From Swiss-Prot:
It comes from the Bacteria. GO terms for biological process: translation. Residues 1-21 are annotated as: Disordered. Belongs to the bacterial ribosomal protein bL32 family. The keyword Ribosomal protein applies. Residues 1-20 have a biased composition (Basic residues). This is Large ribosomal subunit protein bL32.
Amino acid sequence: MAVPKKKTSKTKRDQRKANWKHQAALEAQKALSLGKSILTGRSTFVYPQDEAEDEDE
């Protein structure tokens, strides 16, 4: 007979949610920073290009 799993505590749920939001905030900050640097021309970022796209052109 199937037995239900234990309920996850609110603390554990909140920790996971906080971690997820923190990681999302860091990625958003990196994306914004990259966008700003590209617009100002200070970027040293090189866009990766697929070899398949180069062959088509």
